[in-house]
Curated annotation (Swiss-Prot):
One of the GO BP terms on file: translation
SUPFAM superfamilies per UniProt: YhbC-like, C-terminal domain, YhbC-like, N-terminal domain
Record-given protein name: Ribosome maturation factor RimP
Record's signal peptide: none
Taxonomy, superkingdom: Bacteria
Coiled coil: none
Keyword flag Cytoplasm: yes
Length: 151
């Protein structure tokens, strides 16, 4: 996670939790005037559109005061959904035995895109079983990770 994203998580965690939700994670996608700050909120009872709207208002107010992003951006707030993005070691740990897809910054076993079963988490290292091979991936090498939904 980039430094700005870490700062944003720290800044926005309390306002989201004050609404009774958990800040699951966030993504900041820089693209000039089309940059996006995407927050994922979660709750044991589920997330509804009203929850997203309320969190958006709360987060917007904090962002206006703190102003950590000097350029234009669009704020999006949503639930993580069934193919939820994974951001932390704790989140990967919670999905041991489940299938995930990860996009890497640097290749592991010759690939930047891996799909496999989470077999463990050791500190900041993710253990994945990919096509019968056990791979170890540093969490800071994961650009994007998502749970693969089972239906």
């Amino acid at each position: 996670m980039a430094t700005l994203e870490r700062k944003l998580v720290e800044m926005l965690k309390a306002p989201v939790e004050a609404l009774g939700h958990k800040l699951w994670g966030l993504e900041y996608i820089q693209a000039g005037k089309h940059s996006i700050l995407r927050l994922y909120i979660d709750n044991e009872k589920g997330i509804f559109i009203e929850d997203c709207a309320e969190a958006s208002r709360q987060v917007s107010a904090v962002m206006d005061v703190e102003d950590p992003i000097s350029t234009e951006y669009t704020l999006e707030v949503s639930s993580p959904g069934v193919d939820r993005p994974l951001f932390t070691a704790e989140q990967y740990q919670a999905y041991i035995g489940e299938t995930v897809k990860v996009q890497l910054t640097m290749p592991v076993a010759g690939s930047r895109n891996l799909k496999g079963t989470v077999t463990g988490v050791d500190g900041q290292m993710l253990n994945l079983s990919v096509d019968g091979n056990e791979l170890i991936v540093a969490l800071d090498n994961i650009r994007k990770g998502n749970l693969i939904a089972k239906f």
